[in-house]
Amino acid sequence: MTEISIATSVPSAMPPIGAQPDGPAKVTVRDLNFYYGQNHALKHINLALATNRVTAFIGPSGCGKSTLLRIFNRMYDLYPGQRAEGQVLLDNANILDPKLDLNLLRARVGMVFQKPTPFPMTIYENIAFGVRLYEKISKSEMDGRVEKALRGAALWNEVKDKLNASGLSLSGGQQQRLCIARTIAVRPEVILFDEPCSALDPISTAKIEELIDELKEQYTIAIVTHNMQQAARVSESTAFMYLGELIEFGPTNKIFTSPSDRRTQDYITGRFG
């Protein structure tokens, strides 16, 4: 992770927003529109998430960044009156296809929420539960999967002697890492983080950020955050959204040091948001 100094002035040249990732695309969004009933919440979104990179989504509350994140695994299908139009391609297959197997999609695209949500069961069962939904494996194979997931979430050394303890007995930061372990145990390809550190203390936040930096070696990651410094630290690409529109998208260093749009500049310097 690198520190980026936030710019205080906007260059006179105003090139168009970029829509290409800094590598092969894992997820490609084409002319995406989203509606809550009659409310046009997302408007003509075009962007791509690079494989094994971290893409940050920033913008004021209500701008549509969390809505966009929930489209990537079709969570909006859980609520009536919501619909998406356009294309969201995961390895060139449109996940908006109504015939798509949503269980398979949500195995491929995992999600970690703002508030830690461990299940009211043991640490071991928190990890094993999701695996059992998709696979039938032996006890020894499950033991190995649980250990690997907990190691992947940098939690194994803290819980290896109390796997039968309740997941709810862990600290807030540990619970969030347990949720990350639960997500990676089903072997996703993409992980979505929706404000994963907003309820955590600075020490726990630092651990999650270090973990995200490690996880991108195996997974494509998208993170929604209100923390500008966090976006600058953990991501390679950043998308700034405002009022349901993608205002600017490009390399994180450029977005934070020489943004092309005045609205981006005003937001990252705290003039609104």
Swiss-Prot record:
This is Phosphate import ATP-binding protein PstB. Part of the ABC transporter complex PstSACB involved in phosphate import. Responsible for energy coupling to the transport system. SMART domains: AAA. One of its GO terms (molecular function) is ATP binding. The complex is composed of two ATP-binding proteins (PstB), two transmembrane proteins (PstC and PstA) and a solute-binding protein (PstS). It comes from Rhodopseudomonas palustris (strain ATCC BAA-98 / CGA009). Signal peptide: none annotated. GO terms for cellular component: plasma membrane. It is an enzyme of class 7 (translocase). Its EC number is 7.3.2.1. The gene is pstB.
